[in-house]
Amino acid sequence: MIEAVASANPNTVVILLCGCAVECPWADSVKGILYMGLPGQAGGEAVADLLYGRISPSGKLAESWPFTYEDVPSSKVYGKTTDALYQEGVYVGYRYYDKSGTAVRWPFGYGLSYTTFAYSNLTVDGDTVSVAVKNTGAFAGADCRAHFRFHAGVAGRAFFI
């Protein structure tokens, strides 16, 4: 249905209200996608503010979004037994996609804004990371930077922690 609407109106924007990654085979045929997660009672007002440009999106994805359900490692066993099988070990989320080389639609940490930012003066002092962030765009906006430390992981694989 989304593809049919987008074909009739090239300015279609899809608003996703969901608590996890979902398949979005129509993603390339719409003008925009606004992922709201589970926004609660003020969600409608937040959507309106974002769509009308009163505020700029600044969130980042907390998980990788696969292209299809079949790209999820548990898809091969889910529903085939009454037992819960946790065969992935530490290879869940981005770790699985990284290790297996499976392409994802949107990676962990992905997010867009109506504005742009410049970064400078990166410093690292032990566990403290600092960076100067400057809004270089035409819209007011906030930026959410995530910095990760690598752990040696299992069998020499590095993991974000």
Give residue spans per PLM region.
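Cysteine protease catalytic core and zymogen-processing segment of caspase-like enzymes
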Residues: 1-6
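A short helix->loop->beta-strand "cap" motif at the edges of active sites that frequently abuts
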Residues: 7-12, 30-31
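Detector for Asparagine
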Residues: 9-11, 121, 135, 151
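Secreted, periplasmic, or luminal enzymes acting at the cell surface/secretory milieu
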Residues: 17-142
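Short aromatic-acidic-glycine turn motif
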Residues: 72, 149-161
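Short, hydrophobic/aromatic beta-strand segments
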Residues: 140-147, 159
